[in-house]
Amino acid sequence: MPIRYISQKLAQQIDVELMSASGAFSLDQLMELAGLSCAQALAKSFPPTKHKHVMVACGPGNQGGDGLVAARHLHHFSYTPTVYLPKPSSKDFLQRLVKQCENLNIPILKDVDAFQTELAKSDVILDAIFGFSFQPPLRKPFDQVLKAIKGVSKKIPIVSVDIPSGWSVTDGPQPLWTEEDDKGGKEMIETFEPEVLVSLTAPKEGVKAFKGQHWLGGRFVPDELGKKHELNIPPYEGIDQVVELPRNH
């Protein structure tokens, strides 16, 4: 049976079930496993011998938390990661992830100009900005961030976490509008298409047409939960935290 592509509503429901009394996971446990999956997928696609410098672009929410975890693991996998985190969260568990990166001397940038400078020096980008809960319009500074990543996307490969930033979780890639400025004007921003996608738990409906290399990560879904929602998750091999899905042609 082919793997199931799930809706935003079902993705949220599965998260709730995983963190319920019967699922027994905590949010930071799931984030740790998700971030490890992303780091391993990037390592399989872009080994550190040729892609040592990784720009990890993080949003303010749980997607950014996955990126922070991945940055820590990438450091231990012999990469040189740099984190861009313009809007650090006030949540304790996310602040601890930042501190863990700082303890490894992983640079954490907040300024968009510094981000653009370091982006140009990167060998690969890990896109952990927006997840399946993102709702337009696009707010500062992420309008500049997405434009910058789009601008280098033909030269520097992108690995996106769960869903490429700015894509509709239902309909896939679409133009994004920024929020209105002081004069009532707004700008259309084109989204980028990554070379590699790491879906978490199960792929989302909006990536059905994705044609790049596609990994599934998040090796934490109990068999009964997978059967209940007919996810048809393929088996993971050995100690791997990711499994490659068939490419669309």
Swiss-Prot record:
Residues that hold (6S)-NADPHX according to the record: N62, Q63, G64, G65, D66, G131, F132, S133, F134, Q135, P136, P137, D162
Binding sites annotated in the UniProt record for K(+): Q63, D127, S165
GO cellular component terms, A-Z: mitochondrion
A Pfam family this chain is assigned to: YjeF_N
Annotated compartments: Cytoplasm; Mitochondrion
Cofactor note: Binds 1 potassium ion per subunit.
Cofactor(s) the record lists: K(+)
Transmembrane segments annotated in the record for this chain: none
Domain (YjeF N-terminal) ranges: 11-233
Molecular function in Gene Ontology: metal ion binding; NAD(P)HX epimerase activity; nucleotide binding
EC numbers, comma separated: 5.1.99.6
UniProt function note: Catalyzes the epimerization of the S- and R-forms of NAD(P)HX, a damaged form of NAD(P)H that is a result of enzymatic or heat-dependent hydration. This is a prerequisite for the S-specific NAD(P)H-hydrate dehydratase to allow the repair of both epimers of NAD(P)HX.
Protein name: NAD(P)H-hydrate epimerase
Species: Cryptococcus neoformans var. neoformans serotype D (strain JEC21 / ATCC MYA-565) (Filobasidiella neoformans)
